[in-house]
Amino acid sequence: LRVAAAFVTALALLPSQAQQARLDEVKATAEEAYLYGFPMIVGYDVMNKFFIDRDSGQFKAPINTLSNEARVFTPKDTAISTPNSDTPYSMAMLDLRAEPMVLCMPVIEKARYYDVQLIDLYTNNFGYIGSRATGNGAGCYLVSGPEWQGEKPPGIAKSFRSETQLGLVIYRTQLFNPADMDNVKKIQAGYKLQPLSTFLGKPAPPAAPAINWPKLTPEMFTTGFAEYLDFLLQFAPPTGTAAVEKPMRDKFAAIGIGADRKAPPKTPPSPEVKAALGEGVKEAFAKIGATAEGVGTTVNGWQIGSAAGSREFYKGNWALRAAAAKLGIYGNSEAEAVYPFTRSDASGIVLDGSK
């Protein structure tokens, strides 16, 4: 964990009352940072298993490559907690640093629902393609990163801008019944994902620098979260619509998040600071759980509502965004789908997946 040496030294020199005030500040900052970053860390866990670690047991495809799965998910698919079972998935992790990516859709019969969900590294849904949003006709769509300054080229129906350099695209194609799977396969074969340069028939720009991906550890969800959030935020510049978050993110530097990544390693935190960080994480996780319990309204024992959406939907409510990641990361926005949840049966007995 990268905690500034000066900060640690200052704690050691302060009188006890002032030192406690600073420890309280560390705890509060850790709580805020964990609420803010929890969805990003959960998302990295999924992306790493699906698109980065070829030995994860759930690897699907390299980055910027579309993976089609003409099957329904089963309990063995553990990376995402609540996948659909009637909309076979196609997925891709996007790296938009070098250039935009172009997504081309085939004609899909009007009776069949499909959607293509565009998700940034924050887990905000920043755009949709599909039956509701754009219709079932053929078309090509451009997805760019935050720094891209180009114009929408000919042949592109619509452009989408991600606030982050890394993102995810999830396709859902309706399956009418088991015998319909071959039709789903044909539709999935018509989905195309390619770099803009390939779409235009031009030379590719220079490749983006290689990324040293951190390995997954249990500590990434506890006291080690700051290292992972610090790593992820380098791909999420606080510019454009994300600029409103800069003052908050500047505060995170006190616990080693967002500090100068080129600086030498910082002094490890003292036991007191580490304990304060742990308390902040504990408070944040409790708040995430409480927020998840309160999502939507209860109807006949079912908790019905949506915790997933765009930046505009969340309005800075980081606890709600974190609750969405806890309930089922990468959920659709409410305009696209509604998710009923329950934890007990009609008799009030808590459901147990092991049975």
Predicted segments with their positions:
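Bacterial N-terminal signal peptides
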Residues: 2-12
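Sec/Tat signal peptide C-region and signal peptidase I cleavage site
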Residues: 14-18
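A compositional/structural signature for long, glycine/proline-rich flexible linkers
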Residues: 19-355
